[in-house]
């Protein structure tokens, strides 16, 4: 079953799904902007197109992730994103 979600007045949209070999995950697109997301459980985020500038919990500096690059977010935390251009991603819930 697919679950469609929309955040930040429609600037971020995702489709959640569950599949063999991947488990629970979502794919989505973020429009340009700045966002803060909270996590319930650990997440693995992979950029598909575009780029994400990310400030992870406890990190002193922002990091830029481009297509094919992955970052991990601890559960029960918040992380900040700066998005310059429309960017697609895959999020796996660990």
UniProtKB/Swiss-Prot annotation:
Record's keyword terms, sorted: Glycosyltransferase, Transferase
Coiled-coil annotated residue ranges, if any: none
Signal peptide: none
Catalytic activity: a purine D-ribonucleoside + phosphate = a purine nucleobase + alpha-D-ribose 1-phosphate; adenosine + phosphate = alpha-D-ribose 1-phosphate + adenine; cytidine + phosphate = cytosine + alpha-D-ribose 1-phosphate; guanosine + phosphate = alpha-D-ribose 1-phosphate + guanine
Highest taxon, organism lineage: Bacteria
Entry's EC annotation: 2.4.2.1, 2.4.2.2
GO-annotated cellular components: cytosol
Function: Catalyzes the phosphorolysis of diverse nucleosides, yielding D-ribose 1-phosphate and the respective free bases. Can use uridine, adenosine, guanosine, cytidine, thymidine, inosine and xanthosine as substrates. Also catalyzes the reverse reactions.
Record-linked HAMAP family: Nucleos_phosphorylase_PpnP
Protein name: Pyrimidine/purine nucleoside phosphorylase
Gene source species: Pectobacterium carotovorum subsp. carotovorum (strain PC1)
Gene transcribed to yield this protein: ppnP
